[in-house]
Amino acid sequence: MGSHYKIDLENEREEFIKVYSILKNDVFDELPKMKLASNAIDYIKELLNSPTITGGKMYRGLGFLYSLNTLLIAKNNFDNNNNNNNNKNSETSQHEARIIGWCLEFLSFFLITDDIMDNGLTRRGELCWYRHPSPFNPTEHKVGMLAINDSVLIESFLFFILKKYFKNKSYYVDLFELFHESIFYTATGQLLDSSSFHLKRGDFTNFTFENYSQICINKSSHHVFYLQIKIAILLTDIMDNNEKQKDDTTCKEEKDKEKEQEEELIKNICFNLGIYGQAQDDYFDCFGDPKVIGKTGTDIQENKCSWLICKANTICNNDQLNQLKKNYGNDNENDVSIVKSIFKEINIPKHYENFENEQYNSILKEIQKLSIISLPKSEILLFLLKKLFKRSK
């Protein structure tokens, strides 16, 4: 990147959005070469202009830019303090970094199929894409199950953009593989998350925090938190500005051990951030205002292994648990109302508040451990943690 400065996320958001117009045009310019019918091209244009991609908080893309800039500032400071004229990182420009940020945002293609599996109504304040009027025939048809193919299209656009801008970069294969790995983990997480819908109603043996953690780690932790940091590290080859310069006699085994310890800490922190963030989403699904969170909750109807039901499974008395087993996972308003009333009866909101504070403090301690090894990387994770803490949507 040409210049390194503390990023202003509000200003950066404006610049970031401008880059999306360029990437859309890259895709649009490619479509005529495929000799597609004009209505198919119009369909894809409407898809790429939908809130599915651009209507969110852009947490992944902007978070990545913050991570990358933080590491680059630290590397520059280290190089300047040690008269090191290493220009290796100039290989990636600010514009290219924003493109990678948008590739991270393209991972929202998972939301399309997630909404179908969850029978969702709204997403990001709009109708879910599969419920959206069909661009082919908006007066008579919804997008419907064609949305499954649309999610594959968006995934393909991600790799089209990666190839267009980064195929000649030394890190292209690594970047490509990181995205594929993250998609693999997320798809596995989606499988785990949706599997409870197929379980027998009233069977709560699956509703444990052990199972819940595995869902969160695979479904959320990898692509929301871990991937952006891994890519930022890949692009910087950082030498932390808080560590003393090591001489040539430092043994390779010691360096490898330190790197392994750092990697393990980062991974565990990201995993716990994913659990924390998913628990927040679960709480909003039940108790949030759809106008604020931008979607209508369906976890109770879909028999989801959510934080709320896992907690209830551990604290309910027999009568309350029997009522939950009778009503949880049913798609009618009366049963949903009974479940919510029991959640309130056992004071789930208070238990959630305690969990949020405990999770914040626990992750903060892990970040403090990381700061001893790598101050810049700990700053990134602290930034992500503060973005989550007490969020309202």
Swiss-Prot record:
Chain residues that bind Mg(2+) 2: D114, D118
Lineage per the UniProt record: Eukaryota, Amoebozoa, Evosea, Eumycetozoa, Dictyostelia
Protein name in UniProt: Probable farnesyl diphosphate synthase DDB_G0268742
SUPFAM superfamilies hit by this protein: Terpenoid synthases
GO cellular component: cytoplasm
Primary localisation category: cytoplasm
Protein function: Key enzyme in isoprenoid biosynthesis which catalyzes the formation of farnesyl diphosphate (FPP), a sterol precursor.
Pathway where it operates: Isoprenoid biosynthesis; farnesyl diphosphate biosynthesis; farnesyl diphosphate from geranyl diphosphate and isopentenyl diphosphate: step 1/1; Isoprenoid biosynthesis; geranyl diphosphate biosynthesis; geranyl diphosphate from dimethylallyl diphosphate and isopentenyl diphosphate: step 1/1
Record keywords, A-Z: Cholesterol biosynthesis, Cholesterol metabolism, Cytoplasm, Isoprene biosynthesis, Lipid biosynthesis, Lipid metabolism, Magnesium, Metal-binding, Steroid biosynthesis, Steroid metabolism, Sterol biosynthesis, Sterol metabolism, Transferase
Stated regulation of activity: Inhibited by aminobisphosphonate drugs (aBP), such as risedronate and alendronate.
Organism in which the protein naturally occurs: Dictyostelium discoideum (Social amoeba)
PANTHER family: FARNESYL DIPHOSPHATE SYNTHASE DDB_G0268742-RELATED, FARNESYL-PYROPHOSPHATE SYNTHETASE
Cofactor: Mg(2+)
